[in-house]
From Swiss-Prot:
Keywords: Membrane, Transmembrane, Transmembrane helix. It comes from Bacillus subtilis (strain 168). It comes from the Bacteria. This is Uncharacterized protein YxjJ. The chain crosses the membrane at residues 25-47.
Length: 87
């Protein structure tokens, strides 16, 4: 009546959280996941900071080319030039 098959405990210990081998494997997996997350965050942080340093500042050529800042760009003239055929 009190007899319990030992094979049941062997299978049970494979998934029991206080098993030493299971604990070691669990922490190895946790450390690997943590290492991957830290590596990805470091890579993203480094790549974005490097990209921001290398990019030149964007300046529009239109204000520098215009002699007066109050000039209005004639959009109709630009549209007509686009419609002109080169041939």
């Amino acid at each position: 009546m009190l007899f319990i098959d030992l094979e049941f405990f062997e299978y049970f210990l494979a998934f029991y959280p206080y098993n030493r081998e299971y604990q070691n494997f669990f922490w190895e997996v946790c450390n690997m996941i943590l290492f991957i997350i830290i590596a990805l965050c470091g890579y993203l942080l480094f790549s974005f900071s490097k990209d921001n340093r290398r990019k030149p500042q964007k300046t529009s050529p239109l204000p520098a080319a215009a002699p007066h800042h109050n000039n209005l760009i004639d959009l109709d003239a630009i549209r007509q030039k686009r419609r002109m055929h080169l041939s």
